[in-house]
Amino acid sequence: MTLERLWQVLDPLWADPRVLSALFCGSAMAVVLLKRLGHRRIQQKMEEARRARDLALERMEKAARRFKQENPGTQTAHILSLTMVELAEKLKEGSLSPESVLYSYMGKALEVNREVNCVIDFIHGCEDQLQKVKQQKEKGLLYGIPVSIKDHIDCKGHVSSAGLVKFLGQVKEEDSVIVQVLKSQGAIPFVKTNIPQTMINYDCSNLIFGQTLNPLNHQKTPGGSSGGEGALIAGGGSLLGIGSDVAGSIRLPSSFCGLCGLKPTGFRISKLGVISPITGMNSVIGMLGPIARDVDSLALCMKALLCEEMFRLDPTVPPIPFDEEVYTSSKPLRIGYYEEDGYFQPSPSMKRAVQQTRKLLQEAGHTIVPFAPPKIDYVVDELFTRGIFSDGAAHLVDSFKGDIVDPNLKSQFNTYKLPALVKRILAIILKPIYPRIARDLSALCGVGSAKNLWDQHTAVGLPH
């Protein structure tokens, strides 16, 4: 009866074009207003995050200034000039104090940040960690070494944002495993660094904390997605940083900023306590790893990380310690190399670096063998790109819900969110003219079924 009465009231109204027009206009206005309100809430959250960062950096600056005033004789320039290995030795022997090193790097990090906008948070617990380190019975391999941490790696009492609004306000209750291990080895995590929104980008910008610049050339990007790490370390504000890498996110910032970086073998380091906008990816394995100024620093970091504490905290990590004998061995090796892979065009500087490295290795007694990577188009398009976007980029697109897309990501995001059918049609149209773009579009459609996903896992894991 109620429905019948409602229909009796509404029935004559549907026939009136003025009513229909008013309903349509009202609905459209409601949609616009809701969208504006949503954007306003997003902007408010971002402003709150920026205020929190500014307050944290003010606290950091006060701490660094206070130490400098109380210890005017601190040899800051000397401390900042030392390599990580040299600094570790001086800290262990006691000729330098952990306080002098930490506050020297805090001051330098602030200076670098003012130039290139690379630091997004001060890990205030570093001062407590400083006291704990001094009380450790055995000095760890990273005793007193300040370490910078990429944004999305959890630190107790801090937010891991991934450059996305949806993660703001989620203060972590405990450290990630890698941060716990660093602390157990005497390291002092002291700042978190900037990243691009979602981290699937080779620049370093997000709408929350802004654009990070390359300290070597402010007109250039530091690379991504561990761009904040690259910028801070290259600017001298950190000795050692922990980044992450799926498709070059450690290696590219290292290259762009003149540093050394390592993406370890998959599952070599625990990823417990690390957030990501893409989950469930098994064909292409992302990994945490170090960025530093030289190879010896990377080796020291890996030696410290691959310890019993890591294996205890995360039993899924293979309990294989760093092999010092292999690392220090002078036994001649047989090493393959190539200057071009047939897919990516190398710059002249890249070719020159390969040639110089080849020459040095030959002079050291190693056998250097040229080779061409096999099936490069198939590997890049079908295994790598389709492996990252097996779901047709659905997880990545979903991560932007309730957020605003960074202008630097607009074209990338618009491609991801195209329906699979549209991507396939565009791939067919573009194939005769731009075959590589066509293959990329096809790969972005994903694998399509569980069977295809399993087939792809097999193709990645087994040579054929």
From Swiss-Prot:
InterPro entries: Amidase_CS, Amidase_dom, AS_sf, Endocannabinoid_amidase
Protein name: Vitamin D3 hydroxylase-associated protein
GO process terms (BP): fatty acid catabolic process
One Pfam family linked to the record: Amidase
Expression tissues: Kidney.
Keywords on record: Hydrolase, Membrane, Mitochondrion, Mitochondrion inner membrane
Gene Ontology CC annotations of this record: mitochondrial inner membrane; mitochondrion
GO terms of molecular function: amidase activity; fatty acid amide hydrolase activity
Disulfide bonds: none
Physiological role: May have a vitamin D3 hydroxylase regulatory function.
Species annotation: Gallus gallus
Location of the protein in the cell: Mitochondrion inner membrane
